[in-house]
């Protein structure tokens, strides 16, 4: 397996991974695309620590469930219905057991126009439990695009990702209780994502001619890259990038993710590989 070729990682920063002996890898896999904002996002670790320090680690009912739902609605619209599960797999299994189809939502992957502007009054940084969201929260976001239930790919590592289902209409499904620690981290990450989507700029890749560079080899949907090679050819492509210090998605069907802030040198190196492989 491709994942087994990755050496022991000692630390991570931004979009790069570092081994104990100092070797650096550009991470374009980003945990299945979850870490679109890069590693070590602001406030995420502190949110986990704050919840742990309160001693409520088991999956008891807690105010964090409501707070996470509020965060999700700030992206998808105040009128949507939000359901929480222990994991993405539990969410998928629940929908499948009810014969419900769903869409996996990747930030910026298609034109759903779900990202609203940053509303700092809705961002419970200091005290998530006692925070009272502002009545000025953006309530104008349309949920018309939610024709199917949506499972958002939350910007947290998979082991720390609760399952979230977002629907335009009410669903006859039963939620699960989720650890407040998991919910607190996810809530912090969703607000981080909201700010990220309002500010991120991938135009550097357009200016560098990425679409023309990748023509016939990769489908470009900034910031995502989908391989156009045959499935059985993808491991060789992955190996070529890995030898050059770049880790692509380990799954053919899951896109690799471009960094919005690579140096000119790293961008040129990556473009050269994309044109060749």
Task: List the predicted regions and their residue ranges.
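Active-site-adjacent loop/helix segments that line or gate small-molecule/cofactor pockets in enzymes
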Residues: 1-16, 31, 36, 51, ...
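Glycine-rich phosphate-binding segment of PLP-dependent enzymes
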Residues: 25-26, 30-63, 70-76, 80
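Short loop-beta-helix segment that forms the pyridoxal 5′-phosphate
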Residues: 73-107
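Active-site PLP attachment segment
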Residues: 106-191
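Structural signature of PLP-dependent enzymes
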Residues: 173-212, 230
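Conserved PLP-binding catalytic core of the aspartate aminotransferase-like
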Residues: 205-240, 256-262
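PLP-dependent enzyme catalytic core of the Aspartate aminotransferase-like
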Residues: 240-277
């Amino acid at each position: 397996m491709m994942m087994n070729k990755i050496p022991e990682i000692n630390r991570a920063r931004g979009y790069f991974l570092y081994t104990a002996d100092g070797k650096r890898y550009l991470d374009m896999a980003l945990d299945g695309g979850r870490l679109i904002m890069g590693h070590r996002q602001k406030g995420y670790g502190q949110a986990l620590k704050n919840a742990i320090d309160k001693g409520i680690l088991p999956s008891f009912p807690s105010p964090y469930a409501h707070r996470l739902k509020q965060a999700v609605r700030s992206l998808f619209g105040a009128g949507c219905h939000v359901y929480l599960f222990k994991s993405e797999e539990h969410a998928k299994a629940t929908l499948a057991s009810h014969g419900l189809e769903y869409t996996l939502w990747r930030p910026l992957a298609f034109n759903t126009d779900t990202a609203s502007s940053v509303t700092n009054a809705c961002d419970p940084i200091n005290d998530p439990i006692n925070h009272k969201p502002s009545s000025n929260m953006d309530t104008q976001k349309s949920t018309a695009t939610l024709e199917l239930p949506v499972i958002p790919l939350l910007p947290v590592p998979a082991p720390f990702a609760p399952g979230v289902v977002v629907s335009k209409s009410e669903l006859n499904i039963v939620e699960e209780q989720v650890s407040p620690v998991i919910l607190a981290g996810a809530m912090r990450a969703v607000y981080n994502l909201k700010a990220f989507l309002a500010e991120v700029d991938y135009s550097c890749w357009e200016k560098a001619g990425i679409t023309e560079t990748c023509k016939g080899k990769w489908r470009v949907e900034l910031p995502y890259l989908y391989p156009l090679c045959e499935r059985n050819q993808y491991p060789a492509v992955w190996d070529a990038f890995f030898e050059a210090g770049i880790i692509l998605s380990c799954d053919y069907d899951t896109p690799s993710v471009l960094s919005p802030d690579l140096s000119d040198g790293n961008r040129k190196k990556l473009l050269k590989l994309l044109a060749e492989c």
